[in-house]
Amino acid sequence: MTDSDESSWIHWFCKQRGNEFFCEVDEEYIQDKFNLNFLDSNVKNYKCALEVILDLNPGSASEDPAEPELEASAEKLYGLIHARFILTNRGIELMLDKYNKGEFGTCPRAFCHSQPVLPIGLSDNPGEDMVRIYCPKCNDVYIPKASRHSNLDGAFFGTGFPHMFFMEKPDARPKRAKQKFVPRLYGFKIHPTAYRTAAEIQKDVTMTPVGEIDSPSHI
């Protein structure tokens, strides 16, 4: 990586605390207008935001939006570009490196034995849901452990990323977890109907009128 790469907005953004799930999108990818089709309708100040991402001179400062507003637009635009980029071969390679290093975290399920996870969105529309983590071992999704990731929009990773990832990198996919938790009481397995039966008994006791409850016999 060159000094110019390290001083770029993209590098700076990805190094911010809470942005560890992002990879650095190649500038060549962003410069190809075909890759940005229809994103202008989703981002305010689209042109200025794109110039921020690419470290271009935005022109007259008097015409620019207020800095916090522009920065928010740049971050949103980068996130939407990122969701597309990580479906490409180059993007998958970068995310594979992070996956192998465990940078996305591990599955909280005990029987998955700290299986590395991938980020996933529950919606492709920005603003609808936050990022989740997907475990390929138990095939389930969870809320990220670190609270700093709770503000990441799930649309910046997309609903299809893990599935494309493992289609391109099948060797990285672990075997599905077979071990399941079995509830026991005093060492015996609890029958699936036990809780329902107990609830029905409790309900019957609760609904029985006081006068109908048998009183103890007297000699």
UniProtKB/Swiss-Prot annotation:
One of its GO terms (biological process) is Wnt signaling pathway. Phosphorylated by alpha subunit. Belongs to the casein kinase 2 subunit beta family. This is Casein kinase II subunit beta'. Participates in Wnt signaling. Plays a complex role in regulating the basal catalytic activity of the alpha subunit. One of its GO terms (molecular function) is protein kinase regulator activity. It comes from Drosophila melanogaster (Fruit fly). The gene is CkIIbeta2. Tetramer of two alpha and two beta' subunits. GO terms for cellular component: cytoplasm; protein kinase CK2 complex. Gene3D superfamilies: 2.20.25.20, protein kinase ck2 holoenzyme, chain C, domain 1. Signal peptide: none annotated.
